[in-house]
Amino acid sequence: MGYRDVAKVGLGGPVGSGKTALVQQLVPRLDDAGYDLGVIANDIMTQEDAQRLQSSFAGQIEKDLIAGVETGACPHTGIREDPSMNLDKIDEFSESHPELDVVLIESGGDNLAATFNPELADYFIFVISVAEGDDIPRKRGPGITQADLLVINKTDLAPHVDVSLEVLQEDAMEVRGDNPTAFTNCKTGEGIDDIMDIIERSVLFA
């Protein structure tokens, strides 16, 4: 079995938007639902995110199913222009764990232009946070407009940074059409069940 037999979900977004926190919320739910999964964390120069995830998921995911990929100075290179390092990791996962159902691939922090190579990700989630301002969807970067699912995280901060969730919702609908948008607080888990439902419908049961 190779990587083409495994559902691949890519998560991208700016630094600090909550990509790793979203992975930390999704993994226990996927595990509880009976899915065998792996996680790849891309970072510019370190394995810090991968190590954090290995610590978080001790006892839930085997350590060899959590891997780090160091992409160098351009985080989008490893997920778009040359995804070979990520694809090699997925192949390694599949060869050692033929029962694997899904791999979550977290990009290093990038800008609104970040997208995934379709060979690497079957489904693309782009994560932003309300702390970046309620004009972010209107900027229409490819990450915003092309993602299968837009996640707007840190909703609890909205009143503290003078951001309107209603404006974010309206603008997201305008620039994304029928593609879904989800609001989350990854610290508390609010909104994560909705994302799980979307992933199951769109990826795992597709």
UniProtKB/Swiss-Prot annotation:
Asked whether the keyword ATP-binding is assigned, the reply is no
Family of this protein: Belongs to the SIMIBI class G3E GTPase family. UreG subfamily.
Localization per record: Cytoplasm
Q: What is this protein called?
A: Urease accessory protein UreG
**Source organism of the structure:** Haloquadratum walsbyi (strain DSM 16790 / HBSQ001)
What processes in GO biological process is this protein linked to?
A: urea catabolic process
Q: Which residues bind GTP?
A: 13-20
Give a GO cellular-component term.
cytoplasm
GO molecular function terms attached to this record: GTP binding; GTPase activity; nickel cation binding
Q: Which PANTHER family does the UniProt record give?
A: UREASE ACCESSORY PROTEIN G
* Name of encoding gene: ureG
**InterPro entries in the record, alphabetically?**
CobW/HypB/UreG_nucleotide-bd, P-loop_NTPase, UreG
Biological role: Facilitates the functional incorporation of the urease nickel metallocenter. This process requires GTP hydrolysis, probably effectuated by UreG.
What HAMAP family does this protein's entry cite? UreG (MF_01389)
Q: Which UniProt keywords apply?
A: Chaperone, Cytoplasm, GTP-binding, Nickel insertion, Nucleotide-binding
Pfam families listed in its UniProt record:
cobW (PF02492)
Which interval of the chain is the signal sequence?
Answer: none
